């Protein structure tokens, strides 16, 4: 690296220069320490090796813009250290290394010398398989989890990365999730920030073990066909004294202007995304996790907070952030075109998942926060009043193809007094389970990839408690076992049913049969795959009423079978199912060529699959009928 390159040009391997590197110089083994502190008056390295005396190992300033460096011989791996920084005000402050790849276990805050290289990976088969598939036309089910509270040992201590590989991976495989999404694993001082208020961006948190232990965990995930997505927070960081905040006594990584520096809601500060050094720090960090940890994707947190300045009373876009996100995504996809870059964005910013060359931000997925908010508000409403907010369940289809969406039932909605998904459902005990089964049925049949927070799969009753583990004892109760069985059957059905994912991002993959039955709160629609015979009919009843001989318009197949009914007794339902083959009556209904008469279960979802291939019904011009949505697509990535 040229001396000025880090300050003026795109340099995405800054972790190779900065931090603590075990090297041999002048035939002496030791550690080369390099750090950026543009307004420091003097710098030194301190640790047990010099009894934390900042007068002993003074660093040399190697660029006018504030790069400092020093080689210290005879220091070995696992040595703890910090930088002692003399500020322009004459104070001496002690800081952890921004580029450290390992740190002490909290509450201690020193950095640790660690050789990040040397792990032998065994995931070449995983990499080859990924390249053969297009994620856009594949099933995608993401299990979101918090590493520290998924499961704990009997004595309350945390499972390590290696132990989690043994505990978590078989569970994820059993449930047929395609990916896990882990809440932030960068080093962070405060457990209850869940990792979102980090400061050690290059250090996998030592709460669970070493960086090599985390590599082992990812390697094992890949061995069993599970992708690993990490929550990543490039927008803001914590203000703890040992971290990035006021690193050299002045705003270094954060904005100088207090109006845009502070995040009063979170108690954090925003990265100055207009600085080349900060961009290089963050984009290098993303590539570092990709290269060293073989991560398969990032869920980029709080994109809305990045896109807009947080000045009170203003909604002005932050052009630094817009430019940064485009640069970030270009760098990531240049590194790995099969990577997942998901934006957690609640705004209406256009073209989030469009390529940068089309004027987009360059992500390939976006959380559909609007769908999540609308659907949960609808489900929390008393069933008899749902007819008055009917549009909350249909509105999402007006924009479902404007972006590549993931439907999130995430941690944000089951904490801070919002209740668990199960407990959001109104009514008595039976009603709650029936409606959660219904919600999941709608979730898995609506266009978009899927994400569920841990515990939802068996109907966690209490909201998420981040200092405890999940209520695994609920499996002792029959209704929770029924829920768990239902969820596993539903996800298995989803994965083997091409209509439910093959055209997720194309309007040809969805068609309303009846979106207007607000009086009965019944919705029916078709999901379509690439082939005409790959079609499913879905009927959802959001009230407790049961309907016999209910007419539903269907595509022109001769017979239909009900392949899933959430009211089946084996799932804890009342047993209002359609056991017999359903003959399609050749009379048009709901703008379809034929219809079937079925039993609609209470708080139930019924999924029908055609038995025989389409008979070849013709339009007047002689062409075959094609199932089609009336929504216009934005276009594929």
UniProtKB/Swiss-Prot annotation:
EC number: 2.4.1.18
One GO CC term, this protein: cytosol
Keyword annotations of the record: Carbohydrate metabolism, Glycogen biosynthesis, Glycogen metabolism, Glycosyltransferase, Transferase
Catalytic activities: Transfers a segment of a (1->4)-alpha-D-glucan chain to a primary hydroxy group in a similar glucan chain
Keyword tRNA-binding attached: no
Enzyme kind, highest EC tier: transferase
Pathway assignment: Glycan biosynthesis; glycogen biosynthesis
Regions of compositional bias (Polar residues) in chain numbering: 628-637
Gene Ontology molecular function: 1,4-alpha-glucan branching enzyme activity; cation binding; hydrolase activity, hydrolyzing O-glycosyl compounds
Transmembrane spans: none
UniProt xrefs under CDD domains: AmyAc_Glg_BE, E_set_GBE_prok_N
InterPro entries the UniProt entry points to: A-amylase/branching_C, Branching_enzy, GlgB, GlgB_N_E_set_prok, Glyco_hydro_13_cat_dom, Glyco_hydro_13_N, Glyco_hydro_b, Glycoside_hydrolase_SF
Single GO biological process annotation from the record: glycogen biosynthetic process
Gene3D superfamilies the UniProt entry points to: Glycosidases (3.20.20.80), Golgi alpha-mannosidase II (2.60.40.1180), Immunoglobulins (2.60.40.10)
Active site positions: 301, 344
Residue ranges, annotated region (Disordered): 611-637
Subunit and interaction comment: Monomer.
Family, per entry: Belongs to the glycosyl hydrolase 13 family. GlgB subfamily.
Function: Catalyzes the formation of the alpha-1,6-glucosidic linkages in glycogen by scission of a 1,4-alpha-linked oligosaccharide from growing alpha-1,4-glucan chains and the subsequent attachment of the oligosaccharide to the alpha-1,6 position.
PANTHER family with a match to the protein in the record: 1,4-ALPHA-GLUCAN-BRANCHING ENZYME
Protein name per UniProt: 1,4-alpha-glucan branching enzyme GlgB
Lineage start: Bacteria, Bacillati, Bacillota, Bacilli, Bacillales
Gene of this entry: glgB
């Amino acid at each position: 690296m040229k001396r000025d390159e880090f300050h003026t040009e795109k340099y995405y391997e800054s972790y190779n220069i900065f931090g603590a590197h075990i090297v041999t110089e002048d035939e002496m083994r030791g550690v080369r320490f390099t750090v950026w502190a543009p307004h420091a008056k003097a710098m030194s390295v301190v640790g047990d090796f010099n009894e934390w005396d900042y007068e002993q190992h003074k660093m040399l300033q190697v660029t006018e813009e504030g790069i400092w460096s020093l080689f210290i011989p005879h220091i070995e791996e696992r040595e703890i250290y910090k930088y002692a920084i003399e500020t322009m005000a004459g104070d001496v402050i002690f800081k952890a290394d921004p580029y450290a790849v390992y740190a002490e276990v909290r509450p201690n805050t020193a950095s640790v010398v660690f050789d990040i290289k040397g792990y032998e990976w065994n995931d070449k088969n995983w990499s080859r398989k990924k390249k053969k598939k297009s994620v856009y036309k594949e099933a995608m089910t993401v299990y979101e989890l918090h590493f520290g509270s998924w499961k704990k040992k009997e004595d309350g201590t945390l499972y390590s990365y290696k132990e989690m590989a043994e505990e978590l991976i078989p569970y994820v495989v059993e449930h047929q999730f395609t990916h896990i999404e882990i809440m932030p694993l960068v080093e962070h001082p405060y457990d209850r920030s869940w990792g979102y208020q980090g400061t050690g961006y290059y250090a996998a948190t030592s709460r669970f073990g070493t960086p090599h232990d985390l590599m082992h965990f990812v390697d094992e995930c890949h061995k069993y066909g599970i992708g690993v997505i990490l929550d990543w927070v490039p927008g803001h960081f914590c203000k703890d004294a040992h971290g990035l905040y006021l690193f050299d006594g002045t705003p270094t990584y954060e904005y100088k202007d207090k109006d845009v520096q502070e995040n009063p809601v979170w108690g954090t500060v925003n990265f100055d995304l207009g600085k080349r050094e900060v961009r290089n720090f963050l984009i290098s960090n993303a590539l570092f996790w990709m290269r060293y940890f073989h991560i398969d994707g990032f869920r980029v947190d709080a994109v809305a907070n990045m896109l807009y300045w947080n000045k009170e009373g203003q909604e002005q876009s932050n052009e630094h952030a817009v430019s940064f996100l485009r640069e970030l995504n270009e760098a990531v996809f240049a590194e790995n075109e099969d990577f997942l870059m998901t934006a957690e964005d609640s705004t209406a910013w256009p073209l989030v998942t469009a390529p940068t060359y089309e004027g987009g931000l360059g992500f390939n997925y976006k959380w559909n926060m609007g769908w999540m908010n609308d659907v949960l508000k609808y489900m929390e409403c008393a069933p008899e009043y749902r007819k008055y907010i009917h549009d909350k369940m249909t509105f999402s289809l007006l924009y479902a193809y404007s972006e590549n969406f993931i439907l999130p039932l995430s941690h944000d909605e089951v904490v801070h007094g919002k209740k668990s998904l199960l407990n959001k459902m109104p009514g008595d005990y039976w009603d709650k389970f029936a409606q959660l089964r219904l919600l999941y049925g709608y979730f898995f049949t609506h266009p978009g990839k899927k994400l569920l927070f841990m515990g939802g799969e068996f109907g966690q009753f209490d909201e998420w408690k981040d200092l405890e583990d999940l209520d695994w004892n609920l499996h002792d109760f029959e209704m929770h076992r029924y829920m768990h069985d239902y969820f596993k059957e539903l996800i298995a059905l989803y994965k083997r049913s091409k209509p439910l994912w093959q055209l997720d991002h194309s309007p040809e993959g969805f068609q309303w049969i009846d979106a207007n039955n607000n009086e009965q709160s019944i919705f029916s629609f078709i999901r379509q795959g690439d082939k005409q015979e790959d079609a499913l009919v879905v009927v959802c009843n959001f009230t407790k009423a049961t309907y016999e001989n209910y007419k539903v318009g269907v595509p022109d197949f001769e017979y239909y079978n009900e392949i899933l009914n959430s009211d089946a007794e084996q799932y804890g339902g009342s047993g209002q199912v359609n056991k017999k083959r359903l003959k399609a009556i050749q009379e048009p209904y709901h703008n379809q060529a034929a219809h079937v008469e079925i039993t609609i279960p209470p708080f139930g979802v019924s999924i029908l699959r055609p038995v025989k291939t389409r008979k070849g019904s013709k339009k007047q011009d002689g062409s075959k009928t094609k199932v089609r949505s009336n929504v216009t697509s934005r276009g594929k990535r």
